[in-house]
């Protein structure tokens, strides 16, 4: 879509003009008018549609052959819908009349050359590119929306390169093109027109920092044929007509949506009249396309697993073996980060979050590297970044981070409906402080990044009461065959005390926690009776329960949950330096691989040969068709304030729902 162009005609000599197919041209007949003119007639050769617009109140009418009263408010509108075969092969003739003269007072002739110009992309995400029915200057969300989609080309398809694909101005391998979006410039019209007219592809300096364009200028199977023409320091490019009527471009994103960047990028092509050597070229027509950079999307634990990651460290051989067996049962790949690479940093959940980006032509997994920068800090970039696996990170300029900036404090819910609004990709959950308080929060650059993705609007929970301060310490999600398709699990001191009281009433008060723990240092056992008589422990867990209850209400409101969607998992906490840590291995901090759950072995009281905590958890989860495997993480993880989820990570299958079909 382009603004109407005005062409002025003359009585002294014929005028020539270029018009674009389907675009209206206003013909100004008032600049040169014979004296005594009262009426005019206008005539066009076949293929030229002429309309008269009398005024704002009356709609336009076809000119036909009748005479029109000469009135300065009248507009003459000319439209051609097919490109010309030759220069000036169509024309419009205006004759000026007086009631006192039988013959026309004068004639004005406008010769027209029509050219069809369109800059197109995959406008409606399904491959249809009909520019007649959409405003390509807009990007519209929803199933009936339209607009192009651009991937941030943040993988590394050529293993011999040291940087990501979009970090330079070259195409290093042909596979790199699969991560780019195609943009096509089509022109139809007389070839001679382009002897003194030119086409310029251009963008703003702002957008040039966020996307770049390659023009195919040679054989498609040769990397050197892809010339970098826009992006970074280049904002305009005169397009040579190398392939006649169609020139193809490949576009890649450089930046994800973020603070100050909505994700929208515009490209324009302008036809310029360069026929006069004494003047600069003048614009005739501009066509525009708008791309939205695809957001980074998180995957909830209810989606099918594809690959499990775990670190091998000095004292976790049995743990790694147990995770490997669970991955085998779930039918997913296992990747073990060796100790030489992790340098005894086992918290792989905290180091990174595995998500994806998606366009109609390509889905690309992308790892989000946390700013925690422990000994694992090189693993995402050196080992996960590669062909068809992208990488992104955000770090504060002053590099000041807290424990909340680890990605055990970054989760996402399954799809939900809350307060009448659908969230088909779920909502991101991050931990912070209470509103108005001065406690710890996730660093601003990470929060800005998450909010800017738009498709999974974040919910901030209260975690500052926890020593580590991660949302995965008190909640998780598991798949379910009914209801909303999932259950939210919440750690519950109240449920644990209730369970222990029931066992005490049945005469099992002497049953011991922590029996059978294998550790370098002897772990002191404690009985149910001792737990239930410890007033400090009881009072502290009442406080913990109040903190979890606060989050429960926030989650019910923001995720649209009812009590039947929530399962309370028995759990106790203890205080360390006025913050909470798990009293026994934290049961909700589990690894979810489809129907297979890897749950921290709690070492709870043994009653009739069974751990009553394990038995209770099984009774809550197995009716959902889930299989519970309890993994001993006591020494290598629990004693270091982490559990199974903290020590593992999962790459999951993307949502079947396409993000561009939602309305944020």
UniProtKB/Swiss-Prot annotation:
Changing residue 509 to R: In a breast cancer sample; somatic mutation. Belongs to the protein arginine deiminase family. It comes from the Eukaryota. CDD domains: PAD_N (cd04214). Changing residue 112 to H: In UHS1; forms large aggregates; decreases protein-arginine deiminase activity. It holds the Pfam family PAD_N. Hair follicles, and epidermis at very low levels. Its cofactor is Ca(2+). InterPro entries: Cupredoxin, PAD, PAD_C, PAD_central_sf, PAD_N, PAD_N_sf, Prot_Arg_deaminase_cen_dom. It is linked to Uncombable hair syndrome 1: A form of uncombable hair syndrome, a condition characterized by scalp hair that is impossible to comb due to the haphazard arrangement of the hair bundles. A characteristic morphologic feature is a triangular to reniform to heart shape on cross-sections, and a groove, canal or flattening along the entire length of the hair. Most individuals are affected early in childhood and the hair takes on a spun-glass appearance with the hair becoming dry, curly, glossy, lighter in color, and progressively uncombable. Transmembrane segments: none annotated. Its EC number is 3.5.3.15. The gene is PADI3. GO terms for molecular function: calcium ion binding; identical protein binding; protein-arginine deiminase activity. It catalyses: L-arginyl-[protein] + H2O = L-citrullyl-[protein] + NH4(+). This is Protein-arginine deiminase type-3. Keywords: Calcium, Cytoplasm, Disease variant, Hydrolase. It is found in: Cytoplasm. One of its GO terms (cellular component) is intracellular membrane-bounded organelle. Catalyzes the deimination of arginine residues of proteins.
